[in-house]
Amino acid sequence: MKTNQSQTAPAEVRENIMGTMEINPLLLKLSIPMMISMLVQALYNVVDSVFVSHVSESALTAVSLAFSLQNVMIAVGVGTGVGVNALLSKSLGEKNQSRANATAENGIFLSLCSFAVFFVIGLTCMKPYFYAQTSDPVIAQQGIRYLAVCCIFSLGIFTQTMGEKLLAATGRTQLSMISQLVGAVVNIILDPIFIFGYCGQALSGTTGAAVATVIGQFCGAGMTLYFNTRKNPDIQISFKGFRPSAKAIGRIYTVGLPSIAMQCVGSLMTFGMNLILMAFSATAVAVFGVYFKLQSFVFMPIFGLNNGMVPIISYNYGARRPDRVKKTIKLAVCYAEGIMLAGFCIFQFAPGQVLSIFAASDAMFAIGIPAMRIICLHFLLAGASIVLSSVFQALGNGVFSLIVSVCRQLFVLLPAAWLLAQTGNVNNVWWAFLIAEIVSVLLSLGFYARINKNIIAPMYSPAE
């Protein structure tokens, strides 16, 4: 690995693309590969659910119940990566190579620690988790087999996620996209082979879905390892004599912990919604699970857009270029709202067609079609909220994102859903999403006004 300053200087000059290239093409250059990458990531759970739905509705329900804890696992990996991404980009913008290297090394260490935690969870917590949500032993056992494999072999997803964030932080989003594609293609190929028993009954059904998923994740992780060691000269990673730095870890989690908490709040929301909907029927839970898988194809491109946006904002924040920061935010909001409008049209005008992908029963169609049409109304407001949430993180104010997320999903959505469920009509429950989104966008706009006044506007003054 490169060690002397003369070798790192050219890399720093090249990295100035985030400070000099016109914003619109730069945002598209960094975001489009990440948007594709995030769509590919959405395929992991969606493909599992599509194939599993052809096994039985109980298997589909089991995978839906597993999603809450799966999302916590993803939250830890992605949230830690968000902290690494923002701080590494900011360090490069400040020309602080040693801090950039330390951020990357400690980020990798944290991803290994995360794997150790979920390895233990996979061995000890599966039964209580599922039986807290359902009394049906068939659904519970199918879920246990699926989620235990995902947790025990989670090293792949944690190393892949961190590797992708390191590539994105240095502007190499195309390589991150390739890593995602490799993992997803492997998963798609292996899913039917395992799920339908071609590798034996012991690895069929939900167990097979999990095995295919983790193999795909390990393949993606291998690609990120190769790209970061061979194709990413702008960070020099060396674990010779490495010791975890409390200071570096603290900086990472100052930005990343709100993101982790925010996504974990989402897991609590899905867990709570499952409990509310199970009072109606297991089919209602399956419909909610299918909705969550389908909506990922709308939301994931915006998360990819944010992944391309964050390093641009962080870099120019470090370089004190407020004009570029504000233009990046405006363009990102416009693109996000365009994506959400497209998603709204699909869910509003073709809900039956998308449900049919999951071998939906008549009962699923009866609940699912009105559910899709009602829930998608909040898409029209969500784009701005999602972008502003990442803006807060990129500017070191991730706590604002956390406040918005907690208010939206715990203080508004779940209570509203519970109250609407008391009407005895499951269709009324779905209106809680629109109610919560209205609160979310109002809070986000208020916090952005504060960020603009206290952080962005002062950058127009010369640094002292």
Model-derived features with residue positions:
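Short alpha-helical transmembrane segments in multi-pass integral membrane proteins
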Residues: 1-31, 88-155, 201-257, 313-378, ...
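Residue-level signal for short hydrophobic patches within transmembrane helices
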Residues: 20, 24-43, 47, 69-76, ...
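Transmembrane helical elements of multi-pass membrane transporters/channels
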Residues: 29-48, 149, 160, 183, ...
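Helix-terminus/linker motif at the lipid-water interface of multi-pass membrane proteins
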Residues: 39, 43-61, 130-137, 193-204, ...
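Small-residue-mediated transmembrane helix hinge/kink sites in multi-pass secondary transporters
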Residues: 49, 86, 127, 165, ...
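Small-residue-rich hydrophobic transmembrane alpha-helices
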Residues: 60-120, 157-176, 287-351, 382-404
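Short runs within selected transmembrane alpha-helices of multi-pass transporters and secretion channels
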Residues: 81, 150-168, 176-184, 209-224, ...
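Structural signal for membrane-spanning alpha-helices in multi-pass inner-membrane proteins
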Residues: 122, 165, 191, 195, ...
